[in-house]
């Protein structure tokens, strides 16, 4: 998923996945702390405009991603903005109902930058979402409303990143 750039210097990456469930069920899995913690990383999410979202990428709190919810439109859309390497980074989540009991979940990271210094980092986000969205689809297909634990497994691979992620 290439980085999109506009003339003003705004950049974005996005990823999406089709998952089973109603918009309300999918919203519960992406826009609540207990829901997102089942398939992403341990998280707290205060569901309201002005609320706080915290995603814990390390158990000791050293890699917490803290953001303020600036848009809250359940069960369709929310935006959280936080400080990132290049400055403010906005992450927009949307849920779109489709036929056949499916919904499309889309996440878009947007940031402003005057150089491409952070482009590789954010390009990596889009690849990471591919793997996490596979987990979301598995969770909603086979384990909805069940509790789980998130963990990370690091394994060296001689394959290109995209090939290794596809095999996960």
Give each language-model segment a name:
Residues 1-6:
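A detector for short, charged/polar N-terminal pre-domain segments
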Residues 8, 14, 21, 33-68, ...:
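Short beta-edge strand/loop motif at the mouth of beta-sheet-based domains
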Residues 13-19, 107-109:
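A structural signal for short, well-ordered beta-strand segments
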Residues 26:
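Glycine/alanine-rich phosphate-binding loops at beta-alpha junctions
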Residues 30, 40, 82:
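Short, flexible helix/strand-to-coil boundary loops that buttress conserved ligand/catalytic motifs
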Residues 31-32, 134:
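Solvent-exposed alpha-helix faces
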Residues 71, 79-127:
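Beta-strand/loop substructures that line and gate deep hydrophobic ligand-binding cavities in soluble
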Residues 115-162, 166:
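A conserved amphipathic terminal alpha-helix motif
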């Amino acid at each position: 998923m290439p980085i999109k750039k506009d003339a003003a210097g705004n950049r974005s990456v996005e990823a999406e996945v089709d998952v089973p469930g109603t918009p309300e069920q999918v919203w519960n899995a992406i826009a609540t702390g207990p829901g997102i913690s089942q398939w992403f990383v341990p998280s707290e999410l205060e569901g309201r405009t002005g609320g706080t979202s915290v995603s814990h990428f390390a158990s000791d709190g050293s890699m917490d991603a803290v953001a303020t919810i600036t848009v809250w439109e359940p069960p369709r859309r929310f935006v959280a903005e936080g400080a990132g390497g290049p400055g403010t980074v906005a992450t927009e989540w949307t849920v779109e109902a489709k036929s056949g009991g499916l919904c499309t979940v889309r996440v878009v990271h947007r940031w402003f930058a005057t150089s491409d210094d952070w482009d590789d980092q954010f390009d990596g986000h889009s690849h990471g979402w591919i793997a996490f969205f596979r987990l979301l689809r598995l969770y909603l297909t086979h384990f909805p409303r069940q509790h789980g634990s998130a963990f990370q497994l690091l394994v060296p691979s001689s394959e290109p990143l995209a090939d290794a992620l596809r095999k996960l």
